[in-house]
Amino acid sequence: MTLTIDHAKKLVIEFCATYPVASTISYKIRETQEELYGPQATREAAGTILGSFRPGRGRAEFAISNFRDEDHFRRTLRHEVLGHYGINTFNPAEKRAVLEGVIQSRNDPGMAALWAEVARIYPQLTDSMKAEEVFAFACERIVSPIRGNVAEGARSFRETCIERTRAMQVSDLINLTSMVAEGLHDR
């Protein structure tokens, strides 16, 4: 099924109904990535761009022609909004601590696949930017509605990001992303 701009807008409205805090940012949905980023942003020059989150503008942007179907779009919504917007709901010191925890986890067997995917897609990024992408890719796997254990998320955050008493494992990343998603759902 080809995704239309109108259908994508309906999916954003559904997403914001599930995650009310997501309605505090704006959404820019266009047919092509050139319409979003300019004529120089062709697939040949920039690669395929599904979407992005611009924290300074508080806006998620999506190029509809690059999506296979609505599930692909929903997954990218979770990536951009739960991941990139969600990580920015931490204060700067907490966000840095989360990113450092994710960076330190790169050799964990459960985290290696996420790190490899990010390294393949974004080889030019700094470790900190790659860590944010790892976080965002983990958010793609969140299934709505969120009913995570906030206490477990807080424990994982404290132990792996603040106190650093142990290395982050994939279960901790799941706890953290679920805690963020639940925060966007419950506020």
Give the ranges of each region predicted by the language model.
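Hydrophobic (often cysteine-bearing) scaffold residues that line and stabilize catalytic clefts
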Residues: 4, 8, 74, 78, ...
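Pan-zinc metallopeptidase signature
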Residues: 116-187
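Acidic glycine-/aspartate-rich tracts in secreted/extracellular proteins
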Residues: 68, 91-92, 142-144
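Post-HEXXH active-site segment of zinc metalloproteases
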Residues: 71-75, 86-123
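Flexible, glycine/threonine-enriched loop-and-boundary segments that flank and lead into catalytic domains
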Residues: 29-52
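Short pre-active-site segment immediately N-terminal to the catalytic Zn-binding motif
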Residues: 57-78
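Zn2+-dependent metallopeptidase catalytic core
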Residues: 2-26
